[in-house]
Amino acid sequence: MKLRELLATVDSVENLPPVLADTEVKGIKTNSHACGAGDLFIGMPGTRVDGGEFWPSAIASGAIAAIVSPQAVEKNPPSDEAVVISSNNMTKACAAIAAAFYGYPGQKLKLVGVTGTNGKTTTTHLIEFFLTKAQLSTALMGTLYTRWPGFEQTATHTTPFAVELQQQLAQAVNAGCEFGVMEVSSHALAQGRVLGCPFEVGVFSNLTQDHLDYHSDMEDYFAAKALLFSPDYLKGRAIINADDTYGQRLIKALSPEKVWSYSVNDSSADLWMSDLSYEPNGVTGTIHTPEGDVSFRSPLVGQYNLENLLASVGAVLHLGLDLQLIANAIPEFPGVPGRMERVQINPDQDISVIVDYAHTPDSLENLLKAARPFIPGRMICVFGCGGDRDRTKRPKMGKIAAELADLAFVTSDNPRTEDPEKILDDILAGIPDTVQPTVIGDRAIAIRTAILQAQPGDGVLLAGKGHEDYQILGTEKIHFDDREHARAALTEREKL
């Protein structure tokens, strides 16, 4: 594609040299070290450094041109202005150029975007599962991986950056996908990564405290999430949780004809449930929808998973799936790695061990409440908080674990560059003096100790890492999987 054709999609680009206008662009790169001959380098401003400052490296590697911010030009003035183009809005420039270069793949798919603090991964997996059951080829992008039939790649971000995202959407189109289901993070929305993606369905699950290391406060966090439901993104229907305070605000802000609300118990919502019966292996009941009512049996436990189920049902109903087909598929849903995932080494195991990604106050509370009915003995919670992230949630999570678990093990969870002991102290500040938690900084030892101390009927909940198979210590990522350590401890326990 010619450079002038790409830049014609952007209204904030200046200084395009005529000599370069008809040059063929072979690829788009945002990493200067990855540039090769014929590439266009887009230097994106970051929170710590402006990537545009590295345009000389990109040009030296063969890039035909660099698009950077005026600030990057000012800090690193080009000696040859013919190769450096400035943009006053790098976010829009990057998204628009990437979409154009890859042939606007988002317009060739029916896209579903799911945003919210908790529930994105389970909801997107449910939507993908239902669409697949209807024999509709679907691409899934989210926290765990990007995948479609015949392809799977581990994810590095919940929502890819614009260039990678458009490339993956184009690959999905080429693979024959008709639908794309995407977790859309607040970071992605604030940074404009999904500009150029017209969503047929937008789902809002909930908003609770998280990412306040990035967003200035909860209102800023909400404003980022709400962008998904603006005309820039949403072209079809919004599916919104009416049981969430922020969801109620969104419902009021949008045109009623564009919204389906959902609620587990409120019959005034567009989608709701009745006749709920909670069992050790799941829930049964009736789902009420704008397309009719249907009985269901779900293997997922917990109130929050009922919300996830309603959201996914609403999304695929809007996309045209048959309600009875959906209900028939629900019992077959295999679950999601690291979400209420049971670790069992034999059928006669006398304790429950559950691994879950719960890493916010709300998700930890939901996990503990969901697990309680199925644990006849003591509930033992092993958890920590990530370093270089929102510090204000740490004492809140400590308080929740102290109140809802019978035994709390406070340990490390990706301390990154922070002092692990300081993180533990922040958590302990929220635990009342009347509760005596076990503090073990080494997560492997904490998991082993909790499982070896467990008595028949007890349940050990390993919270925070879920599907992750790594631990970040300083700037180093080492292999660490809660499930592996749990299996090792269970095997050791059997020999005692």
Curated annotation (Swiss-Prot):
Keywords: ATP-binding, Cell cycle, Cell division, Cell shape, Cell wall biogenesis/degradation, Cytoplasm, Ligase, Magnesium, Nucleotide-binding, Peptidoglycan synthesis. GO terms for cellular component: cytoplasm. ATP binds at residues 116-122. Meso-2,6-diaminopimelate binds at residues 389, 413-416, 464, 468. One of its GO terms (biological process) is cell wall organization. A motif (Meso-diaminopimelate recognition motif) lies at residues 413-416. Its cofactor is Mg(2+). It is an enzyme of class 6 (ligase). HAMAP family: MurE (MF_00208). This is UDP-N-acetylmuramoyl-L-alanyl-D-glutamate--2,6-diaminopimelate ligase. It comes from Trichormus variabilis (strain ATCC 29413 / PCC 7937). The lineage of its organism: Bacteria, Bacillati, Cyanobacteriota, Cyanophyceae, Nostocales.
